[in-house]
Amino acid sequence: MTALDLSSPVAVVGTGTMGQGIAQVALVAGHPVRLYDAVDGRAREAADAIGARLDRLVEKDRLTGAGRDAARARLVPAGTLGELADCALVVEAVVERLDVKQELFRALEDVVGDDCLLATNTSSLSVTAVGGALRVPGRFVGLHFFNPAPLLPLVEVVSGFATDPASATRAYETARAWGKTPVACADTPGFVVNRVARPFYAEAFAAYEARAADPATVDAVLRESGGFRMGAFELTDLIGQDVNESVTHSVWQSFFQDVRFTPSLAQRRLVESARLGRKSGRGWYDYGDGAERPGPHTAAPAGAPAYVVAEGDLGPAAELVALIREAGVEVRPEHGYGAGRLVLPGGGTLCLTDGELPVSKDLVHFDLALDYRAATRIALSASRGVRPGLLAEATGLFQALGKKVSVIGDVPGMIVARTVARIIDLAFDAVATGVATPEDVDTAMRLGVNYPLGPFAWSRRLGATWARDLLSHVHEWEPSGRCAPSLALHRHADAAEAREDTDS
């Protein structure tokens, strides 16, 4: 099954920001496009707005003047649904209400031809439920674009329970012909991106609720150590706290209140107080005129130790040994058993967090980094009874490497490590339940939410057992089940261990 021919008209119903964006994508690809909105005059206003954006593309040399004029000629506002009768594809982008969408598609089914592909851009509703209102649900598919649709490349092509594979393939190939990167996925709450991404927000909010760190510090650690483009607090302020919380609540409810997707009470209170983020002028941060954004907590300068003893294999943090040497600090290697560690001159131990709490007074944990060489900030954590001077020694060591240091509360798994481990876990669970392929999950998370690595690529870098082991330890300290490793992750780690036993 191939993509729609460019001569085939495409209709977009709903002319808000997303509807306009989808219409622009189809228009620039070369299709005749019909715009329809239930509110009189909105389709014409949307056509004018799209025309203005085409003008800006010409100004930026991304579209020729002739291309703009041809595109404008192909864009037609429709006054009634009947004017969409000859369309080969109708994409719906109306309000996220099941009854409204079902009513619309029932009406469309009475208008369009039998071979017309019907698609919903829903981000939170069941594609199966929306399509269940149709007499012929086989031609119904989800086409989930990401906002802004003309700029973001990802499109999730969602097959409902009754979607004909040929319909899904045609939608997939059409999205690709439009210059997008489609990923195929089954109809599951949150599809790929909004399902696998929940821990990015949840673990940040959990650290805040546990008083381990404030929003500015969590955001800085996620950006400067984790390699994420934005922290969870600033990102949800950009998305809109009401929108983000609604998606989380929808996924949680759709999974029958699965504890892994439990919403944040702190975020709920933010929404209830109308602190919705940038659009309301205040969310986690204040965006009012003259407001100063708080900076992250950063440790005061401390002296570097003269040497460290490196025992065993530091695993994902092994690069630190070379960095310490390059900083002029002597490294004394020693053979060790079990997890690697750095022993400081005062006798204290510095370890990469493994999901345990640093209960010993002689132990400091440091957080995971995407790339320890490139990281500009490292989080440290110790018990409240840590031996005096040990945190200063650990801080001085990382400062000698050119890193800012944020000391956070003693939460198991800290910030980056716990977030990455949970994302990896949900990715394995999604693949095991037939939602998407590992390759498509990685593509979706990189392109849909700008993660520096896909979950499976991250798992390969960190080791097959890393996420399972860390989450198992976190679960021992927090036995609610939210961080318990999935069966899929257990199987993956167990298989890797079995291969190692066979090879040894």
Question: Which stretches of residues belong to each language-model region?
Answer:
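A short helix-to-beta-strand connector/capping loop
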Residues: L63-V76, G138-R139, K180, K361, ...
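Glycine-rich phosphate-binding loop and adjoining beta1-alpha1-beta2 segment
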Residues: H31, Y36-L63
